[in-house]
Amino acid sequence: MGTSALWALWLLLALCWAPRESGATGTGRKAKCEPSQFQCTNGRCITLLWKCDGDEDCVDGSDEKNCVKKTCAESDFVCNNGQCVPSRWKCDGDPDCEDGSDESPEQCHMRTCRIHEISCGAHSTQCIPVSWRCDGENDCDSGEDEENCGNITCSPDEFTCSSGRCISRNFVCNGQDDCSDGSDELDCAPPTCGAHEFQCSTSSCIPISWVCDDDADCSDQSDESLEQCGRQPVIHTKCPASEIQCGSGECIHKKWRCDGDPDCKDGSDEVNCPSRTCRPDQFECEDGSCIHGSRQCNGIRDCVDGSDEVNCKNVNQCLGPGKFKCRSGECIDISKVCNQEQDCRDWSDEPLKECHINECLVNNGGCSHICKDLVIGYECDCAAGFELIDRKTCGDIDECQNPGICSQICINLKGGYKCECSRGYQMDLATGVCKAVGKEPSLIFTNRRDIRKIGLERKEYIQLVEQLRNTVALDADIAAQKLFWADLSQKAIFSASIDDKVGRHVKMIDNVYNPAAIAVDWVYKTIYWTDAASKTISVATLDGTKRKFLFNSDLREPASIAVDPLSGFVYWSDWGEPAKIEKAGMNGFDRRPLVTADIQWPNGITLDLIKSRLYWLDSKLHMLSSVDLNGQDRRIVLKSLEFLAHPLALTIFEDRVYWIDGENEAVYGANKFTGSELATLVNNLNDAQDIIVYHELVQPSGKNWCEEDMENGGCEYLCLPAPQINDHSPKYTCSCPSGYNVEENGRDCQSTATTVTYSETKDTNTTEISATSGLVPGGINVTTAVSEVSVPPKGTSAAWAILPLLLLVMAAVGGYLMWRNWQHKNMKSMNFDNPVYLKTTEEDLSIDIGRHSASVGHTYPAISVVSTDDDLA
């Protein structure tokens, strides 16, 4: 027998004798459970946490056999029944022991409130933060925290409204109802303006230099009227071919013209439109829009006003416990089943072997929890906190998958769940909401010519910065107590201290042509902004001395922007065609789309860092939505033509989302999970554009890796956080201004405007290489490198002497490569196509090339920084 035949016989015998896997079919063996599971004697798999927990989860009780008596850890509280729970759950107002002993009066009556807390009374074990007293909300179960509060006393520079609310004295007699009860506009004398001011028709005053400058500063545009200026104001906006220009100056998509939904501020896109009628196969909503007829009464609000789901009838009338559906299709009352009379055409209501038999009497019907006997047959049910994973077996419900079931942190337990709060928050037992501990949170928003603040608890309403021109974007560095805003008229970004009563502000960044939004990186001390005119996203240091384009391609109408310096990502919206929300590293790498479907006009975005979600407003769809930070798990929070008529910007804090609506000129708030509990916080605004929450917990502290080992990370220009994709991701990378590349050392900058000339000199036989650079920005010193390369004499015969040796070397190399190719074909190989893996491994191989001693940051060797900056130049 030949060698090949022997090998074949040996392989056949090995296959026949090889033991089969335990999960193979046809062996009769039980399926193998996961390492995190326990296998019952009957083969069922349960989570390992349920073994020896005192509760029989296997039908045969095998999970509670041979169990050693459990001992609680030192950090646990021992319940009276022996159960262990974390000590922090003791006396928190929520019974966690099955016997409730963690909340017993014996355990909790001696509870001592911590510093900065107050007791809810002699007969209460509840403690609340001092800042929650007299905040207008009942936080104690007894409501004692809101008793004997008295009237709020306003400061000398504030006005007390009839309702007791405090507002800035600058709001009194300004022609707007800022108290919301009109008391700030009572008994007002006719307003007068200064010698160098112009009085608008609304009685407000503006500098005389702002009149007839083609920029309406009066809310009624009287400073640019034909009567005042002798001409119509010149509208400088020029829209691209895919857009139309509104009468009020802005640009919108052509396809939005005459679609029944006003998108222009003045509604000019819906003027002189032909009357619309829906096709026969369509349903006409009450607002005049058309949807496909199949979408009517489908259980989903397809019309913005929800009229497609009104007066819908349930076509299936055979629902509920009092009905029985025959196999032949009829629907009869359950009382007619097993009454020895034919009510179904096929006699399916009178099965001989199933009527008057209680299957639950034998082995509980095979049900793991509850067996319910029915007139015909039976059904299995589960205890609270459990659900059927098949028709008989109950498994734990993961309640934490339900949005909003907990305010912040949800811990899934067997048959239930536990809610907790993040650091800096405390749970309000009355509402279950995690509320911030410390100073009162407030909303700060732009109002065109000023910046205002309203407290979220006491509703104090004041003016922070006044005498501005056209404020459109806003953010803050809360730790530094600084505000940053962009002014459209002055094409610049400004800064001011939030507690500066004088109102001084400084121009930080100039030549910002059409700033749509700004976002402050509070960890690395930089600022990001979108520019709708130049179609760019830029980044700069907070003092404005160093700046660059981060992205200047594939942007149509960049709008809102948000940053997460803790993970190194920046997010922005773009309402161009096609509209989308994108995500990228804050250093300009790893750009990718986040939301691309069912999105039309994403005006505002904001991040919920605690829940790791992104929220956005769609002004065209009149919708507030959210996704996780990978673009998954999309949810619609609110859809409303009334409260989301033309939303512009939004922000999130605790369990509330707040937004500005441009058409209603108001600030609204709602529950961020459900969109319920709608409330109006401020109205009668004047072209408000942006809004933020001001509280220390909005910007969690983080480590600035650029200052960890050396100043600015050793970078010559900008040091920017890198996206934290995996454990191998660098903490930061160096970045250069537009027109410059990062050198191989990963730190220094080199001009991309380099020209190379060759000049041959007979005397030295060398070629001179000279570099000519363009304009060098401040702070960048680019040195010109000149090298000499020896040129061999012409006509030399030295090359002929080494030619045989060269041919021999080439033959040896060729033979080696052929051997390598043969060896490669006879080896097992593994392909790694995952781009993240490829990028990571390439980085690991190149991490130490030309890098300083700090190991936390480096450039991306696998993705050339040079080519990226070339694209941005």
UniProtKB/Swiss-Prot annotation:
Disulfide pairs here are 33-45, 40-58, 52-67, 72-84, 79-97, 91-108, 113-127, 120-140, 134-149, 154-166, 161-179, 173-188, 193-205, 200-218, 212-229, 239-251, 246-264, 258-273, 278-290, 285-303, 297-312, 318-331, 326-344, 338-355, 360-371, 367-380, 382-394, 400-410, 406-419, 421-434, 706-719, 715-734, 736-749
Q: What is the effect of changing residue 96 to A?
A: Complete loss of entry of Semliki virus into the cell
Extracellular-side stretches of the chain, per the record, are: 28-797
Q: Describe the PTM.
A: Ubiquitinated at Lys-839 by MYLIP leading to degradation.
List the InterPro entries.
6-blade_b-propeller_TolB-like, EGF-like_Ca-bd_dom, EGF-like_dom, EGF-type_Asp/Asn_hydroxyl_site, EGF_Ca-bd_CS, LDL_receptor-like_sf, LDLR-related, LDLR_class-A_CS
Q: What, per the annotation, is the impact of changing residue 825 to R? A: Insensitive to MYLIP-triggered degradation
Gene Ontology molecular function: any one: calcium ion binding
Q: So which residues are the signal peptide here?
A: 1-27
Q: Which residues form the EGF-like domain?
A: 356-395, 396-435, 702-750
Residue ranges that the UniProt entry lists as topological domain Cytoplasmic: 820-873
Q: Give the span(s) annotated as (Microbial infection) Interaction with Semliki virus spike glycoprotein E1.
A: 117-139
Q: How does it assemble?
A: Homooligomer. Binds to the extracellular matrix protein Reelin/RELN. Interacts with LRP8. Interacts with LDLRAP1. Interacts with SNX17. Interacts with DAB1. Interacts with PCSK9. Interacts with PAFAH1B3 and PAFAH1B2, the catalytic complex of (PAF-AH (I)) heterotetrameric enzyme; these interactions may modulate the Reelin pathway. Interacts with STX5; this interaction mediates VLDLR translocation from the endoplasmic reticulum to the plasma membrane. Interacts with CLU.
Role noted for this protein:
Multifunctional cell surface receptor that binds VLDL and transports it into cells by endocytosis and therefore plays an important role in energy metabolism. Also binds to a wide range of other molecules including Reelin/RELN or apolipoprotein E/APOE-containing ligands as well as clusterin/CLU. In the off-state of the pathway, forms homooligomers or heterooligomers with LRP8. Upon binding to ligands, homooligomers are rearranged to higher order receptor clusters that transmit the extracellular RELN signal to intracellular signaling processes by binding to DAB1. (Microbial infection) Acts as a receptor for Semliki Forest virus.
Official protein name in the record: Very low-density lipoprotein receptor
Its source organism is Homo sapiens (Human)
What is the organism lineage in this UniProt record? Eukaryota, Metazoa, Chordata, Craniata, Vertebrata
